[in-house]
């Protein structure tokens, strides 16, 4: 063990006793102490005994420590470098005091870091009277982004610049109530282990188009109300989604009034239990291809699935549908209902 490492126990004890005050000078002193320590294990011991907010401060103020953590502590970096970099364009003169809130667990520590102003906020970040473009770095520990932008009515555009997390399991309510959101770039999102996307885009009523084709959804279970009340949504690409483990698609496109371009023909559903109200009120849809959906299964809840799809003319499903057509297709054209009740033999 080197001479510098012999000092470690005493330094750790000092850290415990003093609890590292919230000033930059202390952070700089600790950085100076850490410079010459090469041992991954010793570094880990030190960081384990520093309060999390101080670790974030160290990382922010010293790129060399950040680099050493990233390169040298592969198992440990996930704890402190769970970074998401986001570019946000707020609505001009929104007039509402709205915050980005990381609400999953109030007992955990989260930092929003404004790269333009060096402003740091814990647990929430105000967008009130912000500039035309805001770049934010979010540090967090949980494997969840539930409700991250919930009710942020002032955001018009979101771009995920950097997204290194692979262990996120919950993205439910992520953009819930973002009524001004017009554009969101999801290409960098890693969704490999996400199980819950329910209400993810609920009431994003300014979105006209969404591309989820790059999402890896092999673990996804819950899609309830994911696009519900996206009343301006016209086109959505779900062509590459893996839905083999999805159990709930109820209210999925509920009241997506202008949706007219959605291709579900490649979706494979094996564990589906609920599709009730899935397309309720989608009065612009003219064609639906659900070739892999077995709507005859008694195990699937399917109340009013296509109710109000008044423009629906072409409907494809696995086999002939033998259920209560008038309930599932309430409000659809008489011709469509007749053809479903009395299918022509091929």
Which role fits each region the language model picked out?
Residues 144-152, 169-179, 195-204, 221-232, ...:
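Core hydrophobic positions of leucine-rich repeats
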Residues 131-133, 152-158, 180-184, 206-210, ...:
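Short loop/beta submotifs within extracellular cysteine-rich repeat domains
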Residues 17, 192-193, 210, 219, ...:
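Serine/threonine-rich, low-complexity intrinsically disordered segments
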Residues 1-168, 292-297, 313-346:
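N-terminal capping/linker segments that flank leucine-rich repeat
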Residues 134, 145, 158, 171, ...:
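Canonical leucine-rich repeat
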